[in-house]
Amino acid sequence: MNKIKVNMLLLCGLLGCSSLAYADVAVVVNLNNSTTLSDSDISRVFLGKLKKFSNGEKATPVNLKFGSATRNEFEEKALKKSSSQIKAYWSKRVFSGKGKPPKELGTAKDIMALVASDVNAVGYVDASTVNDSVRVIKTF
C-alpha cells in the first residue's frame, strides 16, 4: 500500500514538473510594424477573426508546423484551445468556406525570416530563439 502511495506521489510530482518545462512563447512582428495587439486580438488574428491591424494594414498570421511543442504551447496559452480543438476549428471553417488556416512554417528561424521580410506578418517562436530581426509584442 505504501509503495502505491509513493509511486502516485512521484507520478504527481513528475506531471507537475512537466508543465514547468515549457518555455515562454514570443509573438513577433516586423521591426517596421508599430502595432500593438491585446491577448484577445492575438487570438482573433490566429483564428482568422481579425484580418487587419489597428492601423488598417492586413494582418498575416504564420504558424509553426502542426504538432510542434512551441505551437502547442501557443495554442494553449494564447488561443486557450488544445491542438485537436484548433484542428477541428479550422476543418469546420475550411469546409464551410469561412476561412483557411494560417500558413505553416517548419522552424522558428523560418518564422523570423518571414516576419522580418513582411511588414504584415505576425508569428510566434520560442522566446529563447528571438533575435534582433523581429519585434516582440507579447510573451505568453
Sequence positions of predicted segments:
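Exported/periplasmic ABC-transporter solute-binding proteins
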Residues: 24-140
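Repetitive helical segments and hydrophobic/amphipathic motifs
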Residues: 11-16
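Bacterial N-terminal signal peptides that target proteins for export
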Residues: 1-9
